[in-house]
């Protein structure tokens, strides 16, 4: 990417876009402060991306979950159990912007981590009906949830939409969840390296970029600690 930048502690992040040649992709990445958050890996299956524990400890739904699912002409990507829930109801509730309104932030006070989610319809190398958004605590009244989101009828080549759960430091966490657009000036295959290089070495855990003009998650690029 032209200038992929990251705060010191972005938490988890996602991006959906098309590279300079028009190839569609998504990227997902993990950072962590604690040993439990750092003891994770990204496992790519044919139509799923799993965040899995590597320590042998207990499963924690806030750390270990299905991060992406794939249908014949769609995908859903996110940072928690909402991905499985939205996948289960997609046939009857395909509008992600409406579905996001049923979500709230993660139950981890006082941080209240946003649930970040993305979805798109796949048509050859096109990404259409793209939604990237979150469920995050409302600033002045954290018992309330707000749902900032972006809808794009089509993503143009050389463009991606991205968001992260946090945008502060490891000692002063600030929640994010607000989608922004960025320029993509290179191949999708170099996105993983660009994101990995932008992350703080002591906090970065894993990054994956998945090419989306395939029937399954077969063409991927990964980086891990």
Stretches found by the model and what they are:
Residues 1-225:
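Conserved short alpha-helical segments that host acidic/polar catalytic motifs at enzyme active sites
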